[in-house]
Amino acid sequence: MAQVSMRDMLNAGVHYGHQTRYWNPKMKPFIFGARNGVHVINLEKTLPLFNEALAELTRISSNNGKILFVGTKRAASEAVKAAAVDCQQFYVNHRWLGGMLTNWKTVRQSIKRLKDLETQTQDGTFDKITKKEALMRTRELEKLELSLGGIKDMAGLPDAIFVIGADHEHIAIKEANNLGIPVFAIVDTNSTPDGVNYIIPGNDDATRAIQLYLDAAAAAVKEGRGSNVEAELEATAE
């Protein structure tokens, strides 16, 4: 069972919040106190909440659920992509385009264009057009890949989103709320927990903390996928 320990979180600096003057009062239940003008997050609250979230991620993925990892801050971007790829799930790590979930029909058309352009790079189409046109299409492909590359194979809306930084990704959270998609999110002391179904109070800026969240989430998803494969094999054997 994928779990994290108090020591893991302390070592990663999960307990370091923001300066007290930037706090969101809605995070008061999760704050231990302040030290040198910086809020300290109560890890005795975070630990059970995080492990509960991990158990739910495992359950969702064991039912073939799709998890969308979201983290567009510079500190999180590469780690978000790596974690999603590691557990064969999906990600948005560059910029959240408004309507990515709520206007899925339009997004799907853009994904189709992305895949068409990918095909053109391989089937000789680029050899038959002018260099200028080929360059324009290459730039279009790069732009689409940056925005949609992490969801191009998602084939429909996700069953949950795992967010690094509730404050920074508030548009993604709002869209998920509108569609009834469960939201798992790291919520720092300067953020609101509103709209988050599985609140994980913690530092959303430190790279070590971000890596801890993502490693644990990816492990939970892989565990769920593994149990699903085992169940399918048992059913086949019968």
From Swiss-Prot:
Transmembrane segments: none annotated. GO terms for molecular function: structural constituent of ribosome. The keyword Signal does not apply. GO terms for cellular component: cytosolic small ribosomal subunit. Keywords: Ribonucleoprotein, Ribosomal protein. The keyword Ribosomal protein applies. CDD domains: RPS2. SUPFAM superfamilies: Ribosomal protein S2. Pfam families: Ribosomal_S2 (PF00318). GO terms for biological process: translation. Belongs to the universal ribosomal protein uS2 family. This is Small ribosomal subunit protein uS2.
